[in-house]
């Protein structure tokens, strides 16, 4: 029980103006010694935007579609999470030491906190963006079950914090826009969660082309099936059920909850939706990004 008391619900800490989980903020110092390699591939997302999904797709690509190899370890061991650090579990940097090249890496960090070495080495990036309303709802449920986060409070208060960028990793609006801008000068494949839901095979083909690999069509079809939400939700190597309960309590909300586009409509009130839309229009003014909030 002592460990639970030790880790449970610490307040966010600000680093360069960005709020972060306390333990992740502590990882940023050691992360400065990280050395990227030109053959690394970085998976970047704002939280709750399809990170685990695209991680599993890329690991399958790197393993040539071999399902057995993809069952070698949980996804967070196969794709090291750069800024990850909580008591009693190997940190992202520690996991990285045992990861053979070519490495898949994961981050949610905004550019202000990203290790410069990743940009200097021109590391390829697969970025996935998801519509803000579904992210907010999914993040709210995740805050409830992941005990390294502060308690989210009511949905209404959490939504206000989300809109103000006062949740872990800060502003969704800034995150999606700055990585979009980076794609003009850096090798970034910018994908949309909704496109992946609509036509996963098409999006997997884009990823294959981006990483310079090819697989037989029947292998790609197998990947589409194996990386479907239904399959990943029941796969202990992707659904985070191997994580100890004092960190993630799946009885509160499963890590893989619904995996759909448009679920926000079951949560937002009409008034919240109108307020959100007005605020969204201001924050995204002048940005060429376009999101679909349902399919």
UniProtKB/Swiss-Prot annotation:
GO MF annotation list: aryl sulfotransferase activity; flavonol 3-sulfotransferase activity; sulfotransferase activity
Active site (record annotation): 108
Binding-site residues for substrate, renumbered to this chain: 106-108
Keyword Transferase set for record: yes
Phylogenetic placement of the source organism: Eukaryota, Metazoa, Chordata, Craniata, Vertebrata
Binding-site list for 3'-phosphoadenylyl sulfate: 48-53, 130, 138, 193, 227-232, 255-259
Organism, as annotated: Homo sapiens (Human)
Protein name per UniProt: Sulfotransferase 1A2
Gene Ontology CC terms: cytoplasm; cytosol
Pfam families, per database record: Sulfotransfer_1 (PF00685)
Family indicated by similarity: Belongs to the sulfotransferase 1 family.
Enzyme Commission designation: 2.8.2.1
Gene Ontology biological process terms from the UniProt entry: 3'-phosphoadenosine 5'-phosphosulfate metabolic process; amine biosynthetic process; catecholamine metabolic process; ethanol catabolic process; phenol-containing compound metabolic process; steroid metabolic process; sulfation; xenobiotic metabolic process
Catalytically driven reaction(s): a phenol + 3'-phosphoadenylyl sulfate = an aryl sulfate + adenosine 3',5'-bisphosphate + H(+)
Entries under Gene3D superfamilies matching the protein: P-loop containing nucleotide triphosphate hydrolases
This protein's UniProt keywords: Catecholamine metabolism, Cytoplasm, Lipid metabolism, Steroid metabolism, Transferase
Location of this chain's protein in the cell: Cytoplasm
Function: Sulfotransferase that utilizes 3'-phospho-5'-adenylyl sulfate (PAPS) as sulfonate donor to catalyze the sulfate conjugation of catecholamines, phenolic drugs and neurotransmitters. Is also responsible for the sulfonation and activation of minoxidil. Mediates the metabolic activation of carcinogenic N-hydroxyarylamines to DNA binding products and could so participate as modulating factor of cancer risk.
Complex and partners: Homodimer.
């Amino acid at each position: 029980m002592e460990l639970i008391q030790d880790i449970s619900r610490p307040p966010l800490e600000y680093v360069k103006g960005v709020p972060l989980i306390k333990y992740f903020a502590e990882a940023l110092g050691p992360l400065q010694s990280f050395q990227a390699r030109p053959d690394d591939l970085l998976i970047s997302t704002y939280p709750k935007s399809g990170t685990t999904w695209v991680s599993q797709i890329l690991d399958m690509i790197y393993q040539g579609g071999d399902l057995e190899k993809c069952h070698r370890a949980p996804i967070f061991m196969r794709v090291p999470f750069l800024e990850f650090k909580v008591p009693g579990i190997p940190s992202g940097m520690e996991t990285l030491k045992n990861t053979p090249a070519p490495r898949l890496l994961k981050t949610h960090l905004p550019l202000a906190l990203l290790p410069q070495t990743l940009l200097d080495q021109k590391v390829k990036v697969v970025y996935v963006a998801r519509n803000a309303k579904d992210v907010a709802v999914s993040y709210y449920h995740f805050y409830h079950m992941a005990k390294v986060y502060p308690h989210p409070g009511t949905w209404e208060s959490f939504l206000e914090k989300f809109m103000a960028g006062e949740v872990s990793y800060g502003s969704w609006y800034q995150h999606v826009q700055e990585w979009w801008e980076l794609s003009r000068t850096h090798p970034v494949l910018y994908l949309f969660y909704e496109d992946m839901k609509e036509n996963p095979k098409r999006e997997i083909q884009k990823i294959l082309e981006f990483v310079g690999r090819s697989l037989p069509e029947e292998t790609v079809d197998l990947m589409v099936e194996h990386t479907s939400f239904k399959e990943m939700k029941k796969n202990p190597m992707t659904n985070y059920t191997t994580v100890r309960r004092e960190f993630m309590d799946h009885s509160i909300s499963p890590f893989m909850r619904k995996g759909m586009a448009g679920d926000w409509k079951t949560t937002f009130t009409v008034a919240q939706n109108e307020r959100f839309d007005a605020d969204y229009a201001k924050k995204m003014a002048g940005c060429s990004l376009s999101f679909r909030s349902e399919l």
